[in-house]
Amino acid sequence: MQVSTAALAVLLCTMALCNQVLSAPLAADTPTACCFSYTSRQIPQNFIADYFETSSQCSKPSVIFLTKRGRQVCADPSEEWVQKYVSDLELSA
């Protein structure tokens, strides 16, 4: 009786651990940042330190500018000023 109780306890613990591992999202499949709206005005270019594009899994394609103060600003990639900033950042890299 004691052996079957111990075996059952081990089995339940193993199932609980496996369930947590299987239910955890995979890092590569989870977008790190998505934008749901864009900035309504152009940011001064000298405020921008870097940029990255959002994942294709996001509902809205976006460029996220990183400011020198550490803020993230969502911008519309179809805007001319956004394309110019991205191009300038690529050239300076």
From Swiss-Prot:
Any one GO molecular-function label of the UniProt entry: chemokine activity
Listed CDD domains: Chemokine_CC (cd00272)
InterPro entries linked: Chemokine_b/g/d (IPR039809), Chemokine_CC_CS (IPR000827), Chemokine_IL8-like_dom (IPR001811), Interleukin_8-like_sf (IPR036048)
Modifications the protein undergoes after translation, according to the UniProt entry: The N-terminal processed forms LD78-beta(3-70) and LD78-beta(5-70) are produced by proteolytic cleavage after secretion from peripheral blood monocytes. The cleavage to yield LD78-beta(3-70) is probably achieved by DPP4.
Record site: Cleavage: P25, L26
GO BP: any one term: negative regulation of cell population proliferation
Subcellular location: Secreted
Keywords: Chemotaxis, Cytokine, Disulfide bond, Secreted, Signal
Cellular component terms per the entry's GO annotation: extracellular region; extracellular space
Residue runs in coiled coils: none
Family under the similarity heading: Belongs to the intercrine beta (chemokine CC) family.
Biological function: Chemotactic for lymphocytes and monocytes. Is a ligand for CCR1, CCR3 and CCR5. Is an inhibitor of HIV-1-infection. The processed form LD78-beta(3-70) shows a 20-fold to 30-fold higher chemotactic activity and is a very potent inhibitor of HIV-1-infection. LD78-beta(3-70) is also a ligand for CCR1, CCR3 and CCR5.
Listed name of the protein: C-C motif chemokine 3-like 1
Organism whose genome encodes this protein: Homo sapiens
Highest classification ranks of the organism: Eukaryota, Metazoa, Chordata, Craniata, Vertebrata
Gene (name only): CCL3L1
